[in-house]
Amino acid sequence: MEEKIKKKDYNKDIDNCDDELEGLDMSFQGIKVIGKEITLLVSLKQLILNNNDIETIPEDISNLIRLEVLDFSYNKIEKIPTELGRLINLKELYLNNNMIVEVPMELGTLYKLENFSILNNPLVHPYGIMSKDKSLLRFCRENNTNYKQPNDRVWIDTVLKIDQSLETYSFGTFNILCSLYASNLTYAPSWVINLECRKDILMQTFIAYNLDILCLQEVDINVFNTFYKEQLAQKLDYDGVILPKKSFDKVTDQPKKFHGIVTFWKKNKFKLIEQVSIDFFQKIINDKRFKYLSDIHTRIFQKTNVGLITIFETCNTNIIIIVANVHLYWNPEFNDIKILQTIIYLEEIEFLKEKYKHAHIVLQGDFNSLQNSHVYQYIINRKLPTNIFDPWDYGSLNNGVTHSLTLRNAYDGHDITFTNFTPSFKAVIDYIFYSKYLNLISIISPIEDEYTKTTIGLPNIHFPSDHILIGAKFQFKSSKK
């Protein structure tokens, strides 16, 4: 009778919990089973369940993604569910004084853990000898290969019938994650972020899709010069150009060049006729419109993003194509700078479109912008409202901006949920935009959402970057009159 009363009170207490409850202490309550009600309290940051009679941690514990402190010490737990590794915000985890024998490798993904205790458990070798410090977590992280095999990413037709009389050209964009940034990813195994390992997987990806024009971002300059340029020339008949991006050293505050954006093309299909390199910082501070606008000069300081525009003529049909490769600034606190960079870039493309009257346009890259952003809306809708730069003085731009290009998103209407996936971010921020006289006939399929439920972020054993490759195939008619 006493047990039933406790269970009744326990369920009643949970049912009456505030949806925004952040902490729950249920220690010393004689609890044997964790009810589903607890796993629905998604706002919890602390869950204390020590000194009970709990035997099983439910898989649904992974719902509590905001948890920072989790205490299961002094219970009767025999097994740690792999789903526990999805609680990536955990800073404290206490599993000591249970009956745990093994530790799942997925626990290594808990990269924010500061305090971890699993002492006084009958752990088998080698877990037991590593239980006193974080070496157990490192061991799990380094040996975690338990990733579900993703579905093959194949070409998906976007039209019912393809005109066989027209030439087809494939385009793609891929932020491949430079080694400088990869080395800071504490949630990934060292062998996953190792440059040599990632180079091999990246090469396999390039070869598998064999794109006619490939735009890359965050390409290590040294690796481009010593590896990619030569290897891709040999294996895919590519030629390529790189535009280095300056990065400021945090110690010396001096600019250095670690990585850049690259455009590769098939030498047997395209002839390069012009190249335009844009340093957004230099372009903006030297623009007469912004000469006396201190807000712009302050906001743009040390924002060293670049854009690379290459103009090609097709070898068989003499069609002109403007390929614009870009990597916009990342910080969401500087959305005004992203918009300004976009305005400047589209102005340059407009100028080239006037020069090459019948040219087609493919604009692709890492825009660091969501589909509901002003950057995306400006590209698609061709205009900006008058208040987007408030409270800063952007001169005439505060009155609204327009452009004349008609561009579409190649993945519009298709079920793509992300192009960038990390433990703290999962969204579409990379795009392929194309002009209206290009016929989109197929795209590379997205990664299925089911796969992302088994991992906390990229890169991993299957994907070498925190971004994914996206690609599209187009047909277009000759630009000759």
From Swiss-Prot:
Per-repeat ranges for LRR: 20-41, 43-64, 66-87, 89-111, 112-133
Pfam family for this entry, one: Exo_endo_phos
Keyword list, A-Z: Activator, Cytoplasm, Exonuclease, Hydrolase, Leucine-rich repeat, Magnesium, Metal-binding, Nuclease, Nucleus, Repeat, Repressor, RNA-binding, Transcription, Transcription regulation
Stretches assigned to coiled coil: none
Example of a GO cellular component annotation carried by this entry: nucleus
SMART domains membership: LRR_TYP
Name of this chain's protein: Probable CCR4-Not complex 3'-5'-exoribonuclease subunit Ccr4
Taxonomic source organism: Enterocytozoon bieneusi (strain H348)
